[in-house]
């Protein structure tokens, strides 16, 4: 079966990755990060998607979001990327291509894979050497979960309640889960980006049948699940 560069059903959970052209910085100061998030809020109000996790790095952006019928990912990302690029070009006098391609997207199954993807996103600043604790990085969703930092932008991960019976337990277990994924970070990244989607064998095979594509099965395996617990510690 032919392989496509993108799977874009109108409804689904997507990990979206957008990079600056030639991996150049797209955020230079706090106001740039904040402007991007403000733009995202405005677009969310118009397109009714749920944002579960995000991380804004200096030269790229990770979003983990769920789209709804009538509001495609392509519409959302086209508006978001264009609006921020216009802001940046006006502020810094930039000329030429701003983003590298349009964006990359990966469908994610609503299962442990969704949590593994969330941890990967929120560990980006740690792996980049920008901080030792993801809670210290201000431009990600980690503190929304680990510390209950308020957010007008974020919706709770659909699997949030699997982390415990109370908010305090869930926050503690979530933090332990994310930090526990550090040891698997490189292996997850290498395996993950060789595919078009992240999920179980059944999930990937259903996508192959639905979209008439081939999804790589190299190194497939479930993320470790034992660290997601509802037990008090």
Predicted regions and their residues:
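Short acidic-rich active-site patches of cyclic nucleotide enzymes
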Residues: 60
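Short Pro-Cys-Gly-centered "Cys-loop" motif that presents a nucleophilic cysteine in a tight turn
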Residues: 1-53, 57, 66-233
């Amino acid at each position: 079966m032919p392989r496509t560069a993108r799977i874009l059903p109108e409804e689904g959970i997507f990990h979206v990755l957008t990079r600056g052209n030639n991996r150049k910085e797209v955020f230079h100061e706090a106001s740039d990060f904040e402007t991007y998030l403000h733009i995202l809020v405005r677009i969310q109000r118009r397109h009714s998607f749920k944002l579960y996790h995000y991380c804004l790095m200096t030269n790229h952006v990770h979003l983990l979001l769920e789209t709804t019928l009538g509001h495609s990912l392509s519409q959302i990302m086209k508006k978001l990327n264009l609006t921020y690029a216009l802001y940046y070009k006006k502020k810094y006098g930039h000329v030429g291509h701003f983003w590298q391609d349009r964006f990359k997207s990966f469908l994610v199954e609503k299962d442990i894979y969704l949590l593994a993807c969330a941890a990967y996103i929120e560990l980006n600043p740690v792996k980049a050497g920008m901080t030792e604790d993801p809670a210290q990085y201000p431009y990600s969703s980690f503190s929304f979960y680990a510390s209950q930092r308020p957010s007008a932008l974020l919706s709770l991960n659909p699997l949030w309640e699997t982390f415990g019976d109370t908010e305090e337990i869930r926050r503690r277990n979530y933090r332990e889960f994310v930090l526990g994924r550090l040891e698997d970070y490189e292996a997850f990244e290498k395996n993950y980006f060789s595919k078009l989607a992240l999920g179980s064998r059944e999930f990937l095979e259903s996508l192959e049948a639905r979209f008439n594509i081939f999804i790589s099965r190299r190194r497939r395996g479930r993320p470790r699940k034992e660290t997601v617990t509802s037990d008090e510690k």
